[in-house]
Curated annotation (Swiss-Prot):
Keywords tagged on the record: Cytoplasm, RNA-binding
Single Gene Ontology MF annotation: RNA binding
UniProt name for this protein: SsrA-binding protein
Lineage: Bacteria, Pseudomonadati, Pseudomonadota, Gammaproteobacteria, Moraxellales
Gene: smpB
Family to which this protein belongs: Belongs to the SmpB family.
PANTHER family named in the record: SSRA-BINDING PROTEIN, TMRNA-BINDING COMPONENT OF TRANS-TRANSLATION TAGGING COMPLEX
Region (Disordered): 135-158
Predominant place of localization: cytoplasm
HAMAP family the record matches: SmpB (MF_00023)
Length: 158
């Protein structure tokens, strides 16, 4: 039986689908601009980024499609919008580099994971190139081969 992998203590959520759908060329760390109720909901583990992606407007980067489910005990004077567009905090050079690459054919900018760094929420984003169907099959085949190889090696030791 396979053991269920535990996520690191500071990790909030991960986009496992991104590594299957894309070749990750380069990764960046970006801060997230959040409201108070969002931070409280994230601490409760109510964030998902599986369908999220990054868009660029007016030389700024935004996380679009990330879902933060509001808590029932959240503030009554603020109406929570669970899928609002959130600003990513990056350096100007990083934004220019990402925008230049995304404008090329086939490149995309996707969130890979969100985690706590001290008391701040950070988002690891990746500059990604889309995989074709045969690339996905090759990746699965290589992963299965490595697993079988490890099993065989383990049996030889016993």
């Amino acid at each position: 039986m396979s053991k269920k992998s535990k996520k690191p203590e500071n990790q909030i959520c991960a986009n496992k689908k991104a590594r299957h759908e894309y070749f990750i060329e380069e990764t960046f760390e970006a801060g997230l601009s959040l409201q108070g109720w969002e931070v409280k909901a994230i601490r409760a583990g109510k964030m998902t980024i599986t369908e999220a992606y990054i868009i660029f407007r007016n030389n700024e980067a935004f996380l679009f499609g990330a879902h933060i489910q509001p808590l029932l005990s959240s503030s009554t004077h603020v109406s929570p919008d669970s899928i609002r567009t959130r600003k990513l905090l990056l350096n100007r050079r990083e934004i220019e580099k990402l925008m230049g690459a995304v404008n090329q054919k086939g490149y995309a900018c996707v969130p890979l994971s969100c985690y706590w760094k001290n008391s701040l929420v950070k988002c690891q984003i990746g500059l990604a190139l889309g995989k074709k169907q045969h690339d996905k099959r090759k990746t699965l085949k290589d992963r299965d081969w490595e697993r079988d190889k490890q099993r065989g090696f383990k049996k030889d030791l016993d």
